[in-house]
């Protein structure tokens, strides 16, 4: 493979938007309609952080068709992202564990067929890893189509060289950049537009359906068994890294403050250990509900009906941000600048809805509570 062209973030030499003085050659052959493939496979938080790039593309390229390749576990979330046409699920994590199994070979062939069913004018690798480079390389491009990727690593993010080897054009980004802005800037460089305005995620939850859990002993309003009689705040304590956790005693103190202030507490979990923690917290509270195990789709839809979310740096907390919920994100490390809620523009004259709290070894319950009280007043569950 030849070394790709490397550009700084800015107008790319590849596919261009059909307006604003840009080169329309690549899109003219398609009647002004561009087909874009986003490659962002995992993890949960990273997938959420890529969603605003889709909304930018829709705003800048009317009529654009956007497909997205993602790990199957996160596909239910991407299907709720406005503007995504086809979600192409893969299971690279599982396939790598059993590469020669008959089931793996069958599923791999089916995945390749789905991936190559359409030709794309732009294949954009937003992941920057070998596995995403492989997917981008396998994707089919149109006659004038090109593959794009990051030319360099950004602070705190994984990056592997094959992503730039596979790309027709690798785009250099500033190393100190928020995860949301990184994806937005890369897509903007591909099509020659500027990133403006706050990030819009376009995450639209589904309606509460019959499979969404009902709290025992609560009939709710209007026949909807989930709807709370008072505002409910979800606490997200689970995380894949032990050093991101918050002490159990701190969760209990926070939950007691919420109960005393008139909030009900909901506790999410994804593993047996997290469920045990949820039950331990709930046992110390007057009004708490440990949610049953749910798929990502039901969990997203259920969380959307809460008055707010307080959680550690985890995928569920990032979903809360994308849903636009009042949210406090807890950090034991000074990395909120990279993955936490983006700061509100002081000139926008808007009430603050989402903040992060950082301290070492961890923020105190008082600091988190003060952050919660500083937010715009939570509304009752819908």
Stretches found by the model and what they are:
Residues 1-382:
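Catalytic machinery of carbohydrate-active enzymes
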């Amino acid at each position: 493979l030849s070394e790709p062209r490397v550009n700084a973030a800015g107008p790319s030499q590849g596919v261009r938007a059909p307006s604003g003085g840009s080169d329309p050659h690549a899109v003219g052959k398609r009647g002004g309609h561009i087909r874009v493939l986003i490659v962002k496979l995992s993890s949960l938080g990273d997938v959420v952080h890529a969603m605003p790039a889709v909304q930018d593309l829709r705003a800048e390229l009317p009529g654009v068709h956007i497909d997205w390749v993602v790990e199957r576990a996160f596909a239910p979330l991407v299907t709720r992202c406005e503007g995504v046409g086809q979600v192409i699920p893969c299971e690279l994590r599982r396939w790598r564990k059993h590469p020669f199994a008959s089931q793996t070979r069958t599923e791999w062939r089916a995945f390749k067929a789905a991936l190559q069913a359409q030709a794309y004018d732009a294949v954009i690798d937003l992941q920057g890893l070998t596995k995403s480079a492989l997917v981008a390389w396998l994707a089919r491009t149109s006659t004038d189509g090109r593959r794009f990727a990051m030319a360099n690593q950004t602070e705190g993010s994984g990056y592997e060289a094959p992503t730039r080897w596979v790309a027709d054009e690798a785009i250099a980004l500033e190393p100190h950049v928020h995860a949301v802005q990184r994806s937005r800037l890369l897509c903007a460089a591909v099509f020659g537009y500027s990133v403006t305005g706050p990030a819009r995620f376009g995450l639209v939850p589904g309606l509460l359906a019959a499979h969404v859990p009902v709290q025992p002993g609560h009939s709710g309003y209007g026949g909807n068994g989930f709807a709370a009689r008072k505002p409910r705040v979800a606490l997200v304590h689970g995380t894949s890294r032990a050093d991101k956790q918050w002490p159990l005693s701190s969760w209990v103190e926070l939950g007691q403050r919420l109960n005393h202030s008139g909030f009900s507490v909901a506790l999410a979990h994804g593993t047996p250990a997290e469920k045990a923690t949820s039950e331990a917290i709930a046992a110390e509270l007057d009004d708490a509900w440990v949610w049953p195990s749910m798929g990502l789709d039901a969990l997203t839809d259920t969380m959307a009906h809460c008055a707010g979310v307080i959680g550690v740096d985890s995928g569920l907390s990032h979903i809360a941000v994308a849903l636009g919920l009042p949210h406090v994100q807890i950090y034991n490390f000074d990395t909120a600048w990279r993955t936490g809620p983006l700061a509100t523009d002081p000139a926008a004259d808007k009430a603050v809805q989402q903040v992060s709290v950082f301290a070492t070894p961890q923020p105190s319950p008082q600091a988190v509570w003060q952050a919660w009280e500083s937010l715009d007043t939570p509304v009752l569950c819908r």
